[in-house]
Regions:
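SAM-dependent Rossmann-like transferase core, predominantly class I methyltransferases
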Residues: 1-65, 72-81, 198
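S-adenosylmethionine
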Residues: 33, 66-68, 72-204
């Protein structure tokens, strides 16, 4: 239905959507509403990796009105959708959209741009889940879903490249969905913090 009416809700906000982006449904919205407490101490600069429709970046801009928000995506088509939403919400002065393969475009004068908060809902659907995916999800862009045999192709890159772009007290939040177990098995020595959501969702 959202693709038919070109509209979807996220955190009580209305967004334009079409077949170039995922329908907003991330449980990260619950963390945004709670201002990422108790982990986030400062939010002057926020980055969303793989922004799609821009819903997470825009929601962050509303919840942190003093912050500057960068939102990147590798897909030009997705960025066009995000631009519609940034303009409709009147946030062009606060939210900057960039085409980038993850962090590749985020340099300033030769140095990595740094952020207090980096949020990402990258593709994380593994091969088995992709084969069993319900029909309603197959209308969504595969570029935003498919992530290799174990669902971690993009997740591992985000985790490995984020450190160079985080402030010393910065926070990284990544949604990995059903690939949570595979991630724990790949990095057994990491002390992951997994969220519990009142409104449903896991793997964050």
């Amino acid at each position: 239905l959202p693709y038919i009416v070109n509209r979807a809700q996220f955190m009580g906000l209305s967004f334009y959507v079409d077949e170039q982006v995922l329908i907003p449904r991330s449980p990260i919205g619950e963390l945004i509403e709670g201002h990422f407490s108790p982990w986030l101490t400062t939010a002057e600069r926020i980055l969303e990796i793989g922004c799609g429709s821009g819903c997470i970046a825009i929601a962050c801009a509303y919840e942190f009105p003093e912050a500057t928000v960068d939102a990147v995506d590798i897909s030009n088509a997705a960025l066009q959708v995000a631009q519609v939403n940034v303009d409709r919400h009147g946030l062009a002065n606060q939210v900057r959209l960039l085409q980038s393969d993850l962090f590749s475009a985020l340099t300033l004068d030769g140095s990595a741009e740094r952020y207090n908060l980096i949020v990402s809902n990258p593709p994380y659907v593994d091969r088995a889940d992709l084969d069993e995916m319900p029909a309603e999800f197959r209308a969504e862009p595969m570029l935003a879903l498919e992530a290799g045999e174990d669902g971690l192709d993009l997740v591992v890159r985000v985790l490995s490249e984020a450190a160079a772009h985080l402030e010393d007290d910065g926070l990284l939040v990544v949604e990995v969905g059903n690939s949570q177990l595979a991630l724990q098995q790949l990095f057994p020595d990491v002390s992951w913090i997994w969220m519990e959501f009142e409104q449903g969702g896991d793997g964050v």
